[in-house]
Every structure is written in structure tokens, then in C-alpha cells.
Amino acid sequence: MKTACLILPNFKIKSELKRCPNLSNRQILIYGFNRNKEVVVDYTNNINGISKGSLLKDVLLGIKDPVILKEDDRYYSYVQDQIIGDLFKLFGRLEINGYECVYIDTSYICRDASDRLEIANTILNLLSKDFNPLLGFSTGKYSSYVSALMSSPGDFNVLKFDKNRIGEFPTLVMPISDELKKHMHLLGLTNFERIANFKRENLLS
């Protein structure tokens, strides 16, 4: 397994809670701007029925007294730089994909399962458990990403990629927006096999 993927779900929320731990039991919405409209860019897990990219004004109709924060990319970059700096001290080959995803090339140090266990423990011990890190190992970037999504917070998962079983993968592991995943689920497209069997003209409509 030559690639590790580290996912930090709700990174912006976790960063804000690192700064203001007194908000830990509150419903929090972080908003930014898309085409001059205020949209939700992250939110706490105690808020249901919304997705990233939703208009803030629409979301507020269904939530009573949430904490509303404007996204602070300067601060999030600072928090991320600390994490990446610690990883760079141990692993020289990293690829950063936004705030929530880091790929780590382990091909030159991971020879067997015992090496992988040591690498996983090293990565997870670098991070605060409050970030609920997800860690996955596989042969390539996307399969390691899927592996991470299938792991448990604070733990790691190993995925032996088999192209003959790709149809079983849930659509939630696709690197697409939450809103699009929601629409696909409403159409019954819950795994890759169902997408493959869906008529192309219907899929594009």
C-alpha cells in the first residue's frame, strides 16, 4: 500500500472550536460567498437536513439561534500549516488537497503491515483527536481516499483495490459536492453500479 490519505472532516468547524472551545455544544454555521451570495461552507454535526453550498438565508429558516461565523481562511491556513509542518518533518512527499485532505506517499517506507501500523500511529498521534481524523491506505490516491472515508474517526483502514468490486462503492465516496450527492441519492443512485446502469441521458438531465 503505497499511498495514505488523511481526511480531516469539517476542518473549518474543528478549527473554530479549537479557537473557541466554549462553542462545542452549539449549532454552528460557517458561511462564505459564492457569486456574491452567502452560502454555508461548513456546519456542526448537530445540524441536519442541509449541505455545504446551501444559501445561508434558506438554512436559517429551519434553525433556531445558531452561532453564525464568517469563514476565516487566514486562520484556517494557520491551523493547517501547523499540521502540514508536523507531517513534513516525518514524510517528505505530501500532496495537499484543500483544507480537509492530504495524500502521503509511503511507498519508500511502507514494506509490510507492521510498517503501515507504525505509520498510521505516527500520523494519528500528531493530530488532536478533536479533529476526528480519518486515515486510509491503498495503492493509489483515489482508492486511499475511499479507504479513508470508510475508516472510523481516529483510526485507519486498508483497502485492497479490486476493479471488479468497484460497483459496490457507495456514492458518498465520490469527490463531488454534498448537494450533488443528495440529488443522486434521491434518484436512487446509491452506489457505482447503479450509476453505471443509469441511462446516460437521464444522468445528464
Q: Which residue ranges define each predicted feature?
A:
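Short, well-ordered loop/turn elements at secondary-structure boundaries
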Residues: 1, 24, 129-131, 178, ...
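Residues that scaffold, gate, or flank divalent-cation-dependent active/transport sites
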Residues: 1-103, 108-110, 114-117, 122-124, ...
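Flexible loop/turn segments at secondary-structure boundaries
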Residues: 37-38, 143-145, 202-203
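Flexible, active-site-adjacent loop/turn segments at secondary-structure boundaries
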Residues: 39, 48, 144, 164-172
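Generic, well-ordered alpha-helical scaffold segments in large soluble proteins
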Residues: 62, 86, 122, 126, ...
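Short, well-structured beta-strand/strand-turn elements
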Residues: 66-69, 93-96, 133-134, 190-193, ...
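Structured, non-catalytic alpha/beta "coupling" segments that mediate domain-domain communication
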Residues: 114-155
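Compact, charge-rich alpha-helical regulatory domains located at protein termini
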Residues: 150-205
